[in-house]
A protein has these predicted regions:
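Short, surface-exposed beta-strand/loop micro-motifs that present aromatic residues
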Residues: 76-79
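Short, conserved beta-strand/beta-arch hydrophobic-aromatic motifs that form part
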Residues: 90
Length: 120
């Protein structure tokens, strides 16, 4: 079993947590939001239970220690920290075949910020 943490910027804000909370609220009356919310939560649970030992349609290594969870058209970036923890960084809705470079760069910047503040 692994520990999953949500990245928070230096002001204590987690965009991913806020996004999931918004989806959870919308899911009461919106079927698409309900499906997205359940998929993302399931994939986070799979990561927590199995680590990166999941099929590539669930998780994929991108580069430089940055991974992505792949629930539907959503992508949730994360990295492994201290061997038994995963830090969930941010998400975006994938609209093209290739993951946009700016999203990967943002994930790397968030990871570097986390490591600078929390330590290797």
């Amino acid at each position: 079993m692994y520990t999953v943490e949500f990245y928070e910027n230096d002001r204590g804000v987690s965009e991913l947590w806020d996004f999931l909370e918004e989806l959870r609220i919308k899911s009461a009356s919106n079927k698409d939001a309900r499906i997205q919310y359940k998929q993302i939560v399931l994939y986070i649970q799979l990561l927590q239970d199995n680590g990166t030992r999941l099929s590539e349609n669930v998780t994929k290594h991108l580069m430089d220690g940055i991974w992505e969870l792949r629930p539907g058209n959503n992508r949730v970036f994360y990295f492994c920290w201290r061997g038994d923890r995963f830090v969930l960084l941010h998400q975006f809705r994938k609209r093209s075949q290739k993951t946009p470079r700016r999203e990967i760069e943002r994930a790397k910047a968030d990871r570097d910020d986390w490591l600078a503040r929390k330590g290797e």
